Amino acid sequence: MESAKKLALTAALSQYNKVLVAFSGGIDSTVVLDAALKTLGKENVLAVVANSDLFTDEEYTKAMDLAQEMGATVLGTTLDYLSNDDIKNNRASSWYWMKKMFYQKMNELKDNSNCDVVLDGMIMDDKNDFRPGLRACDEEGAVSVLQVANIYKSDVRDMAREAGLSNWNKVASCSVSSRFEYDTELTVEGIQRVMKSEAYLRSLGFATVRVRVQNKLARIEIMADQINDLVAQMFAINDKLQEFGFDYVTVDLEGFKSGRMNESLTADVKSALVD
């Protein structure tokens, strides 16, 4: 018997004839795409994958490949986030503007392909976090069907595993802008430095990793139970990250924590960005 939440997701999708799924290759949007394909049929689903300077080419390619493997019609597009001054200078409002640009592009492609709606992978957990993108989603008329079906991250993992989706345990990724302090100019050089550093650390077995940047200092965040493993390789890691351009390399002893850079924002600033 299907769970109530699966049935709710199917019901939410069934009201549309043809949909555009904003597909990142992450577990959330993968569950949306899988459900849309099963509910509406391949001919009524378009998966769109966006590439930009703030995400790795590897993530883009993997997302394109995954959508094709799932049997979806897939379209790639490119977003020039750094053309927006708020994003380029990493203002507190940058997350809103990134999502605004994203949903506007999705709407343009939706209209061009005669789709009824843009669907994204926002889950219920996102409502309890600092997510300025929710406001942009509402403004641009996109629908978060997982939220409509009252689905949380734990539900998503269960649904993905039960459906046999290859990325059911995939580590979440995020725009590389989240590695930089607010009000810091984002440059191609700085972005590439972070991407190279994180790719190197992943190659050593640290699947969940963030290299936060404070001027020319790298602050590595990994899972707390892996810190000893990192320390055992500290000299090689220090040399490699300095080779990439950092002057100093440190480890955050609290371990990985999503949204760490948001801790510097006051409650008033957060409220102004999401309300």
Language-model-detected regions and their locations in the chain:
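ATP-dependent adenylation/nucleotidyltransferase module used to activate substrates
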Residues: 1-136, 141-162, 203, 218, ...
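AMP-forming adenylation/ATP pyrophosphatase catalytic core
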Residues: 131-163, 167-275
